[in-house]
Amino acid sequence: RSRGLGDVYKRQYYFNVMESRGGCVINYKHDAFPFGIGVPDIERGQFAEAKPFLWQSDTSVMRGSWCYSVQPDKAVYKAPQEIVQDLLDVVSKNGRLLLNFGPKPDGTLADKDVEILHKLADWMRVNDECIHGTGLWRINQEGPTKIQEGQFADGASRNFTSEDFRFTCRGGNIYAACMACPADGKLHIRSLREADASHLPLWHGIVRKVEVLGNPAQAAWTRDGEALHVDLGTYRSDMPVVVKIITD
């Protein structure tokens, strides 16, 4: 356990970095620092619900190892889709994701690591606006699939469905990320259903336009008392699909 900022070395390091780099963030586990001094970290795990404070989840592309490994029981990779699902879940809960890639002894990455990195980069190139600079919306999630809270809880795959959404917002835009693209291309976002004030709706705003990030075609959409319905047309993806809702 750390002895906190009272430790002379840590205090010197903190202020040296603050001066030389213009900022410093302390991440810690197991309540090593008093709450509020740094960013709490959950190793290979997440919170089940959104938090009002910033936090971090750290995990690896391999299920059984932080380091490069050729052992069959260690070298089991997560799918790019699963990593993006984790990213969306964490960010929607006011968290940040630290993702580890373990290099080989010569310092290079294995071909599988590079393949995953390219896949993640392709997704971020299209959908980064739902991640960078966003904040919490009124709720962070919708759907049947729940996350087990706590450390070392990400070993098993989560079977997200097309009914599972994670939400972020920025300015007048709401981002609804569908965790698994539906085979029929029909999305139903129930948290954005239409309702009058007497029904105490979760959100009572006006939808001006709906876009599907990465889909150049204009999205067809309707809104009623059941949900905001979005038709993807012919657009399909093996990765989470992000709907941008532009509001008035």
Across the structure, where does each feature detected by a protein language model lie?
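Mature catalytic domains of secreted/periplasmic carbohydrate-active enzymes
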Residues: 3-248
